[in-house]
Amino acid sequence: MLIPSKLSRPVRLNNTVLRERLLIRLNESSNYRLVLITSPAGYGKTTLVSQWAAGQDNLGWYSLDESDNQPERFASYLIAALQQATQGHCVKSEVLAQKHQYANLPALFAQLFIELSEWRRPIFLVIDDYHLIVNNMIHEAMRFFLRHQPENLTLTILSRNLPSLGVANLRVREQLLEIDSQQLAFDYQETQQFFDKRLTTSLDADDCKRLCNEVAGWATALQLIALSARQSCDAAELSAKRLSGINAGHLSDYLVDEVLNQVGSSTREFLLRSSILRSMNDGLIVRLTGEENGQQRLEETERQGLFIQRMDDSGEWFRFHPLFASFLRQRCQWEMALQLPELHRAAAEGWLAQGYPGEAIHHALAAGDTAMLRDILLQHAWSLFNHSELSLLEECMNALPYEQLLESPRLVLLQAWLAQSQHRYSEVNTLLNQAEQALQQKQIAIEPDLLAEFDALRAQVAMNSGKPEMADKLAKQALAALLPQNEYSRIVATSVEGEVLHCRGELADALARMQQTEQLARRFHVHHYALWALLQQSEILLAQGYLQTAYETQNKAFELIREQHLEQLPMHEFLLRIRSQLLWCWSRLDEAEEAARRGLEVLSNFQPQQQLQCLTQLAKCSLTRGDIDNARRYLARCENLLSNGQYHRDWRTNTDKLRVIIWQSMDDKSAAIRWLAQTERPESVSNHFNQGQWRNIARAQILLGLYDEAESILDTLNQHARELQLISDLNRNLLLCNLLYWHIGRKSEAQSALIEALSLANRTGFISHFVIEGELMAQQLRQLIQLNTLSELELHRAQRILRDINRQHRHKFAHFDESFVTQLLTHPDVPELIRNSPLTQREWQVLGLIYSGYSNDQIAAELDVATTTIKTHIRNLYQKLGIANRQEAIQQAQQLMQMMGLGV
């Protein structure tokens, strides 16, 4: 819940001096990306900008305090301020900020700028007191903000010092408007106006000039002089002399003598008590001071000129001038040290009564009242956790003595979930085990439903650690003891059960459990678990061979992401990745590539290690097109990631599949030998992870001529795939059986395996799995078509596969990889002119791309060089091959294709 006063423009008071010379400059602010107003405290930064803001419609205001160093809090308020400026235009960004569903601040700002790009009018965002930000993460995010903000947005920052935002570049590009303390200082005319508005008896011009010179136009000093001048002109002179040369750091003594000691005891006590509040209203003042009418007291203090200012048009919220607030807090610590804890407790109660647990926690921490902190957490911690207030909760956990945690074991559970949510998996069991042991020693009984919640969390940790049997046991224990109100833990335990069943190959039960998880998660609005359940359903359906149903389930997941604004969660990449994998199966390669690239965009704000699966997908698409060079480039990136991170078996298996197929196409037996010597061999074959890894092993063995070992593996895989109805794995296994039987001369069995694979493909829709087997597959399909034994559907699929294999070979030729050129030059029928031609590898590539119908610009884009460079290559190859134009080049390439047995 956001505090309204932090998003309210300060109210422009009637007796303020209109800073016309500075307002003229600010009226040009729409021509700049950044307006930077810097000065020490008390020079009128906020007052000036509030005067200017009064005439602006599309303006948002964000007043900072120390708590805004939490990135999540900063983001929520900043987006809320821009929502005010745009009348609620940035709905998606607001939801992301409220639910903390973004990778980091730059990722959130990127989404914000997409929405703001549709807003055509000028926008102004004011951030006051930026000097309070000391979190480098926020500074870095604001540097990103300044680099990428829309042209129609102007950011205005008020700060006591130069912020760490890299403004030098903006200054050079004349996109920075700066106002500093010298310009903010009052001139003679403004000083005269200032005193005329505050004093019943006017000062003459010479006196005003002298007073202005004495304090160098410092607005706060002028205000203090005005307070003294109400007593006598001599008092004003004495104040001016005393303030001459003083700065904010040495103002305390003056404020004690000339302000605090000049007010009545009740006002003094009111000022000191209320100083602990960062913002205040009637209810908070009543709670803190015991006065019956807090609003009346606030307005009276304002009339006395005691450095208090309204924060909104309604006059409900007030705050002290920052300089005076700092002074009062310091005096409160000295004069009311013994009462201070009680004051903070009262403030915490006041904030709780108004529905702001975050502010209440701030005061409970300041009071050092861990019992109160514990009580607040017991009431509000899970709400804060579900709103991703993780850093605030972590601070609370660190402040609570361990003994108090044990007195409230549900807070131990919260502490463990904090570790889990921050991926500190190894700490979770340690925290829970230590707590259970300590509670047993103290003979404190743990409620059965709480133990069940412990087990649900432990089950998730066990699943993350690759221990499905332990996870299953814990999940079952949890579900048996959880109460109806333990919704979150029930969702977790049900999901874990579904994952375990999936790993065992019990796909029908796994699907039912994941559908149950989705229903529970949707009912209780735990949207990220609903998304997780849909992703798991898609994977299970794909394993069952129901790819069309998996595709439709993915559509439901995309819809959930759009509805709940989950685009920046890593699970969005998971969805895009499995969509890419499914589209690849169907040989919809352009769409598969697009999905993988979108997945990489989602991951742009995360560690590069997470890119492995999407890069593998891009490599598979290149491989299926016949562009083996590009596939190898992607594979090199994958191998670099594998060497620098720990990955789930499924991830490694996918990349290993790519490796082995490339080694097969290049007859790289030495690489296969090295890999076989060190690769893991899963204990079971009951799920698609393990089936895939054993297929990789069998393919490597076929490459090395280890046919008996490969056949033994494939027999085992097929037996389990048939028993468990792992239809997609059976489809893949049969294609590998076909390869094996062909190599060992069992042509009849090879044909039977291929026919069954084509039959299963009627259900799975597989195309690319056939295509990557290359010319050997094409040869067998041609024979099957000639036999005229295929059904109409299977015949259509076989013809489609043949076309794609043909296109794959054409692509290989178009790119003229080195192995193809070597084969061509050693062909006995190659013309002497070609054999003796000094064509470079790049010129061969250009010739192939000309044949494929590429224009000069397209060739340049494909090879990532300038068009002029391509023209030079074309001129050279024409000269070397004795041809005159593009048509002759195409004819020459076609003759070479036919000579190599590629009938295109």
Curated annotation (Swiss-Prot):
Activated by ATP and maltotriose, which are both required for DNA binding. Gene3D superfamilies: P-loop containing nucleotide triphosphate hydrolases, Tetratricopeptide repeat domain, Winged helix-like DNA-binding domain superfamily/Winged helix DNA-binding domain. Keywords: Activator, ATP-binding, Carbohydrate metabolism, DNA-binding, Nucleotide-binding, Transcription, Transcription regulation. Residues 856-875 bind DNA. Residues 832-897 form the HTH luxR-type domain. GO terms for biological process: positive regulation of carbohydrate metabolic process; positive regulation of DNA-templated transcription. GO terms for molecular function: ATP binding; DNA binding; DNA-binding transcription factor activity. It holds the Pfam family GerE. ATP binds at S39, P40, A41, G42, Y43, G44, K45, T46. InterPro entries: P-loop_NTPase, Sig_transdc_resp-reg_C-effctor, TPR-like_helical_dom_sf, TPR_MalT, Tscrpt_reg_HTH_MalT, Tscrpt_reg_LuxR_C, WH-like_DNA-bd_sf. It comes from the Bacteria. Positively regulates the transcription of the maltose regulon whose gene products are responsible for uptake and catabolism of malto-oligosaccharides. Specifically binds to the promoter region of its target genes, recognizing a short DNA motif called the MalT box. PANTHER family: DNA-BINDING TRANSCRIPTIONAL ACTIVATOR DEVR_DOSR (PTHR44688:SF16). Belongs to the MalT family. Monomer in solution. Oligomerizes to an active state in the presence of the positive effectors ATP and maltotriose. This is HTH-type transcriptional regulator MalT. It comes from Photorhabdus laumondii subsp. laumondii (strain DSM 15139 / CIP 105565 / TT01).
